[in-house]
Amino acid sequence: MAFQSPLTFNDEQLTVAQLKSQLDLFANAQKQAFLNHHPVTDLVLSRAEYMDLLLTRLWRYYGFSEIHNISLVAVGGYGRGELHPLSDIDILVLSKHKLPGELETKLSEFITLLWDLRLEVGHAVRTVEECAAIGREDLTVATNLQEARLLCGSENTFQDLKKVVLSDSFWPSETFYRAKIQEQRERHARYHDTTYNLEPDIKSTPGGLRDIHTLSWVARRHFGATSLLEMSRYGFLTDAEYRELVECQDFLWRVRFALHIELKRYDNRLTFAHQIQVAEHLGFKGEGNRGIEMMMKEFYRTLRRVAELNKMLLKLFDQAIINGGETEPAVIINEDFQRRGRLIEARKPALFQARPETILDMFLHIANDSTIDSVSPPTLRQLRTARRRLNKFLHTIPEAREKFMELVRHPNALHRAFSLMHKLGVLAAYLPQWSQIVGQMQFDLFHVYTVDEHSVRLLNHINTFSYAKNHDKHPICCEVYPRLQKKELLLLAAIFHDIGKGRGGDHSEIGEKEAYDFCIEHGLSKPEAKLVSWLVRHHLLMSVTAQRRDIYDPEVITEFAKQVRDEERLEYLVCLTVADICATNPELWNSWKRTLLAELFYSTQRALRRGLENPVDVRERIRHNQQLASALLRKEGFTAREIEVLWQRFKADYFLRHTHKQIAWHCEHILRMDNPEQPLVLMSKKATRGGTEVFVYTKDQHALFATVVAELDRRNFNVHDAQIMSSKDGYVLDTFMVLDQHGQAIDVDNHKAVIKHLMHVLTDGRPTKVKTRRTPYKLQHFKVKTKVDFLPTKSKKRTLMELVALDTPGLLAITGATFADMGFNLHGAKITTIGERAEDLFILTSENGGRLSEEQELQLREKLIHNIAELAP
């Protein structure tokens, strides 16, 4: 990199404009070098060296070098000699005595110049005594001073500081260690104690650069080690661990450097907005989001490695150094293992290398013994070594297969063993397919965890179905799961359900074959293997049917029941489905989804018990609903004649698609209306099917659906289901199932205002404003190609249209307005939001009440794609 050394700048070059120009030249040279694959370590160190030279030249320019007993000192990361493009430049002006006023004024000019150069300078002016006093009270200051490095000025003054900082009385090694451990715990807690955050902080997230810094700070305080290499020389790290940490740090530095050259202000968050550019800078490429996903996979794997090393090394340090090697007495388990306190440890130094299947033995002991929480640090180090040296996957060892199946069948393995097996890399060492999904992310807002983390969480959620305390949250699963004859089949399906992701093609089909082969290899019968592979192949079937199909249509239930075939499969599938939803995103599971799945489960159960050759009698269901609703209405004082006159105006479909309680509620308010010319808007005070039911009864008008959903969208409410019906005399009876932004029923306190505003827009007569709010920030970084598909159906009267698009504000309203403008009738809608994607189903008829023709479908597709494009953020 060709640029002028700051030490050679003459006084005429020390203006703000000239210095800015030189800094820009240096920054551009570094950027080009990085993009040309120059080693990032050289760039990080050379930036610090450049700043050393610049600050030294300016120090001399202001005449500070002629003043005795003051020093310019680099502290913190700059003290380590590490600077990224936007890193803070932390400096300390150190003096033996308090500075006179004129010198403070001059120092102020010096600092102001640095700020004028747009350098992120953090500074302090202190005496040695002040540093000692503040450092003893403030852990951050103490840590920064520990990394102090003299730039220029008085060597003696700097050495006085070093004597204070290195003295045991400043921060005793054990006290410093305990404080740093607590600081790390608190930092990890801010990131939910997981390395898997969608927009991670490269520096502070668990497994990030701060975890490496913590290791170096602790080692520096105790040994005086000033680098990772020195830490290995003191025996704090093995050579292999040293190389691994250097490799991890190098990758994290490259990610951070790539991020900083894209930003204008200091930030270490790898946001969606910048993941694309960072991936490109690091050479990760692929179709669509493949490059981003490859980069983030490497990133998450690196965080895992750092987090594991950090935890192990700090525990080893605690055990061997802080506690002087003293340990609790060992309790012998067998010839291979013993328990020490709440930790299990191997009794032989090369046990796992000699007999790799004993790795699984260790987890069987953990599952068996509730007093064991984890693995001892020396045994963890042995496990890591054995893991790296394995020349084949564990599942190829017959004894290991037996032990794995013993674990899968163990009643305590779910909550005691599997999460730890994943965390310690044993599942990846056992199963090659699992090793491929470790760190595999999906660039979207729906999947908040990597594939491996999601799968482990799914296993943990299955375990919750064992406890009666969770019955209210998961009534069906808590009833069904305990009676499953072979729970291990469900667990194997959970392990394999997403194992095909990231390899191209349909992950369900990939997983289906691999699950079957795994089951046969592990001694399961063919029927058992077929059940597991069927669950993997169809693990999305129940969720998709419940959320994106009309489950009140007998045809839909019959088709679903045909695919499920029997109640055993249905029971396994509902447990897998619920656990899958809960493990995908903590905010996904709500009363609405619980109700949908329950209705699908029980409708299918009834169909299977009745026999698929005996479909439900629609007329009988209508009569049943009418009888029950009529009884409720008569209790309210209405006569049979009043009820009959009203119901003669309604079509049969209304009585089929509503419960008797809904019918009675609607009709009671319709019969009490003073002015039928005015709209009627009702909102259920109690949650109905897990949400708030909004019922609209009014004379039909153009784009009424669009008008209602636009108003609800304006108030940040989400429509999840709509039944669009009309009476024989031109009135609409529309029902909307609505949730708030948190997936809950709308607060009753808001009902009055919502009804008032809906009444207003329904009587206003002005054109609908389809987009009523700005596109959320996060959605602006995602692209979803708009797709309009027309689904096959046996119905000759209705068309099923599926829409996939970016879930931008106004989408539902513009879709409804398009239907109205083209003269099509909307009869129902199922609204599903999957992160940034909307996947909606609409039931349509043409203007004359029949199915849409192929030409009409083509015109509708073109019009929708055009209109939705107009909404683009």
From Swiss-Prot:
<feature type="domain" description="ACT 2">
    <location>
        <begin position="800"/>
        <end position="873"/>
    </location>
</feature>
<dbReference type="GO" id="GO:0006808">
    <property type="term" value="P:regulation of nitrogen utilization"/>
</dbReference>
<feature type="region of interest" description="Uridylyl-removing">
    <location>
        <begin position="333"/>
        <end position="692"/>
    </location>
</feature>
<feature type="domain" description="ACT 1">
    <location>
        <begin position="693"/>
        <end position="773"/>
    </location>
</feature>
<comment type="similarity">
    <text>Belongs to the GlnD family.</text>
</comment>
<dbReference type="Pfam" id="PF08335">
    <property type="entry name" value="GlnD_UR_UTase"/>
</dbReference>
<dbReference type="InterPro" id="IPR003607">
    <property type="entry name" value="HD/PDEase_dom"/>
</dbReference>
<protein>
    <recommendedName>
        <fullName>Bifunctional uridylyltransferase/uridylyl-removing enzyme</fullName>
        <ecNumber>2.7.7.59</ecNumber>
        <ecNumber>3.1.4.-</ecNumber>
    </recommendedName>
</protein>
<keyword id="KW-0511">Multifunctional enzyme</keyword>
<keyword id="KW-0378">Hydrolase</keyword>
<feature type="region of interest" description="Uridylyltransferase">
    <location>
        <begin position="1"/>
        <end position="332"/>
    </location>
</feature>
<dbReference type="InterPro" id="IPR045865">
    <property type="entry name" value="ACT-like_dom_sf"/>
</dbReference>
<dbReference type="Pfam" id="PF01966">
    <property type="entry name" value="HD"/>
</dbReference>
<dbReference type="InterPro" id="IPR006674">
    <property type="entry name" value="HD_domain"/>
</dbReference>
<dbReference type="InterPro" id="IPR043519">
    <property type="entry name" value="NT_sf"/>
</dbReference>
<feature type="domain" description="HD">
    <location>
        <begin position="451"/>
        <end position="573"/>
    </location>
</feature>
<keyword id="KW-0677">Repeat</keyword>
<dbReference type="InterPro" id="IPR010043">
    <property type="entry name" value="UTase/UR"/>
</dbReference>
<comment type="function">
    <text>Modifies, by uridylylation and deuridylylation, the PII regulatory proteins (GlnB and homologs), in response to the nitrogen status of the cell that GlnD senses through the glutamine level. Under low glutamine levels, catalyzes the conversion of the PII proteins and UTP to PII-UMP and PPi, while under higher glutamine levels, GlnD hydrolyzes PII-UMP to PII and UMP (deuridylylation). Thus, controls uridylylation state and activity of the PII proteins, and plays an important role in the regulation of nitrogen assimilation and metabolism.</text>
</comment>
<keyword id="KW-0808">Transferase</keyword>
<dbReference type="InterPro" id="IPR002912">
    <property type="entry name" value="ACT_dom"/>
</dbReference>
<dbReference type="InterPro" id="IPR013546">
    <property type="entry name" value="PII_UdlTrfase/GS_AdlTrfase"/>
</dbReference>
<dbReference type="GO" id="GO:0008773">
    <property type="term" value="F:[protein-PII] uridylyltransferase activity"/>
</dbReference>
<keyword id="KW-0548">Nucleotidyltransferase</keyword>
<dbReference type="GO" id="GO:0008081">
    <property type="term" value="F:phosphoric diester hydrolase activity"/>
</dbReference>
<keyword id="KW-0460">Magnesium</keyword>
<dbReference type="InterPro" id="IPR002934">
    <property type="entry name" value="Polymerase_NTP_transf_dom"/>
</dbReference>
<dbReference type="Pfam" id="PF01909">
    <property type="entry name" value="NTP_transf_2"/>
</dbReference>
